[in-house]
Structures are given as structure tokens and as C-alpha cells.
């Protein structure tokens, strides 16, 4: 019994077999302790899963660019001046792709429940690009979504104009990621900002009034 979500498989066994625990114990060799643990997880998950509306979807928008690449990073992203030259072309294609998905959402009567703008570093985009992106998201009817979050992970990409653009567009939460509050560590891992930059970015966020 392996995988990142083994309980999902166990739940399917309970739904299709009368002798589920016997099958888990004798055929899959799951210990009694793990069966009890799985049962506890299933019991806790059930009210949440039962409440899910399959017509509600989450929209993830990837901005796979960073001003520089951190030495520990395992995410797919592009950095450096050569890569940053691709932003305009990527952004234009992203808007076209959002048009396609907006049409799919309408055609199948889906409802966007949450929006997450991630990366990379979305605040690598200019304030005007962020404004165009949020304007495009208006085609999805996001007025009453449950969550609208944008990563602002690199303090050296944060400006007041960008955060005001995000807030005015409906973004309720941002993430500012110091990674370390030690300048020597930041330099060692390739972050192009200082602890002072982090503090200034947090002050800008407070001033703008975004969480």
C-alpha cells in the first residue's frame, strides 16, 4: 500500500467491498494499527469530501519567472536576463490560454471557487501586466470566490504600485517569503535582496492593506 494518498485507495475499497478490513489485512498486508489510522482519517475527511461541489474549480496561474534562481530551488522556472526577455511573449500566450479556459468554464457551467497566482515569482510582472491579468480573470466571474491569493515571494520585486494593483483587483492575500532573516544566508543561496528589503516589503503590504 503506497502512494502519497493511500487513504483514497482504502476509501475506494470500503466503497466496493463488504469485507474491506479483511482484504486490507490479508491481501494487502496492512497492519491493524494502520487500518485504525486509515479509518480515523476517513472519518475526519468524510464530512469535507461529502460537502464538495464538483462544479467548483480552482484556477492556478503560473508565472514561471524569477529575477534570479535560488540555489535550493526545485521548481520549474526561468531566471536571468535572457529568460526574462521571454516574459512578454509568455504573458501574451497566457492571456490567450485564459480565454480558452474561460470559455470551457462557461460551456460546462463551472464556477471558479479559488484563484492562486503562483510561480516562479508573479511580481516579476510589471504593475500594468498584473492589471491586465486581473482584468482578464474578470471573464471567470470571480466576484464571490472564496480565496484569491498571489505569491509575492521575492521582496526585491515588490512595489507599492504592484500591491495596490493586486488589492484593487480583488487579491485578498499575498505571500512574502524572506527565506532567511540573515543577510549572509540570503547571499549564499542566491537571493538578490537583504533583510532590510524584506522589512520594507512588509511595510508596503501593511500600507496598502493586503493580508
Question: Which residues does each PLM region occupy?
Answer:
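Residues at the beta-strand->loop junction immediately N-terminal to the Walker
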Residues: 60-62, 118-119
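N-terminal [4Fe-4S]-dependent radical SAM core
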Residues: 2, 15-59, 108-109
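Local cysteine-cluster metal-coordination motifs and their immediate loop/turn environment
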Residues: 62-77
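Conserved non-cysteine loop/helix-boundary elements of the Radical SAM core domain that shape
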Residues: 77-211
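Generic structural signal for short, solvent-exposed loop/turn connectors between secondary structure elements
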Residues: 13-23, 137-144
Amino acid at each position: 500500500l503506497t502512494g502519497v494518498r493511500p487513504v483514497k485507495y482504502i476509501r475506494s475499497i470500503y466503497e466496493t467491498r463488504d469485507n474491506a478490513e479483511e482484504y486490507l489485512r490479508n491481501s494487502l498486508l496492512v497492519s491493524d494499527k494502520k487500518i485504525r489510522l486509515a479509518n480515523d482519517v476517513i472519518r475526519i475527511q468524510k464530512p469535507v469530501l461529502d460537502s464538495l461541489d464538483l462544479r467548483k474549480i480552482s484556477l492556478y496561474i503560473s508565472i514561471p519567472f524569477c529575477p534570479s534562481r535560488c540555489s535550493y530551488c526545485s521548481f520549474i522556472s526561468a531566471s536571468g536576463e535572457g529568460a526574462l526577455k521571454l516574459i512578454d511573449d509568455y504573458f501574451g500566450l497566457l492571456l490567450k490560454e485564459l480565454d480558452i479556459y474561460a470559455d470551457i468554464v462557461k460551456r460546462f457551467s463551472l464556477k471558479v471557487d479559488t484563484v492562486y497566482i503562483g510561480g516562479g515569482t508573479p511580481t516579476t510582472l510589471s504593475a500594468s501586466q498584473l492589471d491586465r491579468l486581473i482584468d482578464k480573470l474578470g471573464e471567470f466571474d470571480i466576484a464571490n470566490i472564496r480565496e484569491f491569493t498571489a505569491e509575492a515571494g521575492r521582496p526585491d520585486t515588490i512595489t507599492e504600485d504592484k500591491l495596490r494593483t493586486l488589492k484593487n483587483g480583488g487579491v485578498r492575500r499575498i505571500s512574502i517569503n524572506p527565506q532567511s532573516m540573515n543577510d549572509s544566508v540570503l547571499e549564499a543561496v542566491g537571493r538578490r535582496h537583504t533583510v532590510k528589503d524584506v522589512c520594507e516589503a512588509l511595510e508596503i503590504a501593511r500600507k496598502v492593506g493586503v493580508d
